[in-house]
């Protein structure tokens, strides 16, 4: 952030206690005060400078740009007034009021009149004294009341430096946040790709069926087949063969002497003779019930009623 951008951001801020304290300390550094034992100073003591500045801000409703431009005039006046000069108790109040009036009239198209500024002092200064203060300051400045951007940056550097540091910290934090966010996105993408590859590998059978798994399955199948063969007895085999001979045209020649499976002969299948097969005639439709009607006329009891 440049100094000009920091200055623009500073001008948008509201008036704070730090600003008032800075203006009061700058005004106090211009001239020294020599205490007097006059009856006027004892009867009507001047308010503290910070309280006086706060009162002017409240009555005039001055904003930060105009208020802080007063520091440029205060800095110029500090370089003009000799260091061996002493003022009275209200000298600092007069200096600040004169610089504020010049800043308000220079930077604004419409500003309070001097009679209004005299009222804002709550009786500390009268209108004639306010007019005198303004003319004396114009003579000190040789009627040159221009305020440049460089002057503002120089005088307000204590306020601009924290703004620049804060902006730098925010930019670095945003950069770190962006890097962390991009790193998290990469991690998420990597995790999703890994999970996708795992799911796709799980769907493929060869990757899941290893050699050990296949051998285990084959051994289990062979054990089950041997166990079932042991349970099955010879009479059951003969019964099953007899049943198959009755209901199927195939006949198996099983030699009981051959107990081993390897020496058993291969069963022979007799060819089926299709010439001896009788054709099957399928009837279409349903059998109709034949209703026998009795055509003979039966005598009924009604004939008795018609006889004469």
UniProtKB/Swiss-Prot annotation:
<dbReference type="GO" id="GO:0000131">
    <property type="term" value="C:incipient cellular bud site"/>
</dbReference>
<comment type="similarity">
    <text>Belongs to the cyclin family. PCL1,2 subfamily.</text>
</comment>
<dbReference type="GO" id="GO:0005935">
    <property type="term" value="C:cellular bud neck"/>
</dbReference>
<feature type="compositionally biased region" description="Basic and acidic residues">
    <location>
        <begin position="255"/>
        <end position="264"/>
    </location>
</feature>
<dbReference type="GO" id="GO:0051302">
    <property type="term" value="P:regulation of cell division"/>
</dbReference>
<feature type="domain" description="Cyclin N-terminal">
    <location>
        <begin position="18"/>
        <end position="146"/>
    </location>
</feature>
<dbReference type="GO" id="GO:0051301">
    <property type="term" value="P:cell division"/>
</dbReference>
<comment type="subunit">
    <text>Forms a cyclin-CDK complex with PHO85. Interacts with RVS167.</text>
</comment>
<dbReference type="InterPro" id="IPR013763">
    <property type="entry name" value="Cyclin-like_dom"/>
</dbReference>
<dbReference type="GO" id="GO:0001676">
    <property type="term" value="P:long-chain fatty acid metabolic process"/>
</dbReference>
<dbReference type="InterPro" id="IPR036915">
    <property type="entry name" value="Cyclin-like_sf"/>
</dbReference>
<dbReference type="Pfam" id="PF00134">
    <property type="entry name" value="Cyclin_N"/>
</dbReference>
<dbReference type="GO" id="GO:0005934">
    <property type="term" value="C:cellular bud tip"/>
</dbReference>
<keyword id="KW-0539">Nucleus</keyword>
<comment type="function">
    <text>G1/S-specific cyclin partner of the cyclin-dependent kinase (CDK) PHO85. Essential for the control of the cell cycle at the G1/S (start) transition. Together with cyclin PCL1, positively controls degradation of sphingoid long chain base kinase LCB4. The PCL2-PHO85 cyclin-CDK holoenzyme phosphorylates LCB4, which is required for its ubiquitination and degradation. PCL2-PHO85 also phosphorylates RVS167, linking cyclin-CDK activity with organization of the actin cytoskeleton.</text>
</comment>
<dbReference type="GO" id="GO:0005737">
    <property type="term" value="C:cytoplasm"/>
</dbReference>
<dbReference type="GO" id="GO:0005634">
    <property type="term" value="C:nucleus"/>
</dbReference>
<dbReference type="InterPro" id="IPR012104">
    <property type="entry name" value="PHO85_cyclin_1/2/9"/>
</dbReference>
<feature type="region of interest" description="Disordered">
    <location>
        <begin position="248"/>
        <end position="270"/>
    </location>
</feature>
<keyword id="KW-0195">Cyclin</keyword>
<dbReference type="GO" id="GO:0044843">
    <property type="term" value="P:cell cycle G1/S phase transition"/>
</dbReference>
<keyword id="KW-0132">Cell division</keyword>
<dbReference type="GO" id="GO:0032878">
    <property type="term" value="P:regulation of establishment or maintenance of cell polarity"/>
</dbReference>
<keyword id="KW-0963">Cytoplasm</keyword>
<protein>
    <recommendedName>
        <fullName>PHO85 cyclin-2</fullName>
    </recommendedName>
</protein>
<dbReference type="InterPro" id="IPR006671">
    <property type="entry name" value="Cyclin_N"/>
</dbReference>
<keyword id="KW-0131">Cell cycle</keyword>
<dbReference type="GO" id="GO:0019901">
    <property type="term" value="F:protein kinase binding"/>
</dbReference>
<dbReference type="GO" id="GO:0016538">
    <property type="term" value="F:cyclin-dependent protein serine/threonine kinase regulator activity"/>
</dbReference>
<dbReference type="GO" id="GO:0051726">
    <property type="term" value="P:regulation of cell cycle"/>
</dbReference>
<dbReference type="GO" id="GO:0030952">
    <property type="term" value="P:establishment or maintenance of cytoskeleton polarity"/>
</dbReference>
<dbReference type="InterPro" id="IPR013922">
    <property type="entry name" value="Cyclin_PHO80-like"/>
</dbReference>
<dbReference type="GO" id="GO:0031106">
    <property type="term" value="P:septin ring organization"/>
</dbReference>
<dbReference type="GO" id="GO:0000307">
    <property type="term" value="C:cyclin-dependent protein kinase holoenzyme complex"/>
</dbReference>
């Amino acid at each position: 952030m440049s100094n000009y951008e920091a200055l623009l951001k500073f001008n948008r801020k509201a008036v704070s206690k730090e600003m008032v304290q800075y203006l009061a300390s700058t005004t106090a550094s211009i001239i020294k005060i020599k205490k007097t034992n006059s009856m006027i100073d004892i009867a009507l003591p001047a308010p503290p400078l910070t309280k006086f500045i706060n009162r002017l801000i409240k009555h005039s409703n001055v904003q930060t740009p105009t208020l802080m431009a007063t520091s440029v005039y205060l800095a110029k006046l500090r370089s003009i007034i000799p260091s061996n000069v002493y003022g009275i108790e209200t000298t600092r109040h007069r200096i600040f009021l004169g610089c504020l009036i010049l800043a308000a009239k220079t930077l604004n198209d419409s500003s309070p009149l001097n009679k209004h500024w005299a009222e804002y002092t709550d009786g500390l200064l009268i209108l004639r004294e306010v007019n005198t203060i303004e003319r004396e300051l114009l003579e000190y400045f040789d009627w040159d009341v221009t305020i440049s951007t460089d002057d503002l940056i120089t005088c307000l550097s204590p306020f601009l430096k924290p703004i620049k540091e804060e902006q730098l910290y925010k930019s670095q934090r945003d950069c770190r946040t962006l890097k962390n966010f991009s790193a998290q996105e990469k991690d998420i993408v990597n995790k999703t790709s890994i999970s996708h590859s795992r799911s796709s590998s799980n769907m493929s059978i060869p990757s899941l069926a290893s050699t050990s798994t296949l051998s285990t399955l084959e051994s289990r199948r062979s054990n089950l087949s041997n166990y079932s063969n042991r349970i099955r007895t010879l009479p059951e085999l003969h019964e099953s063969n007899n049943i198959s001979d009755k209901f199927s045209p195939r006949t198996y020649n099983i030699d009981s002497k051959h107990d081993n499976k390897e020496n058993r002969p291969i069963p022979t299948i007799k060819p089926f003779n299709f010439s001896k097969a009788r054709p099957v005639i399928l009837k279409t439709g349903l059998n109709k019930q034949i209703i026998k009607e009795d055509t003979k006329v039966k005598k009924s009891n009604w004939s008795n009623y018609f006889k004469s």
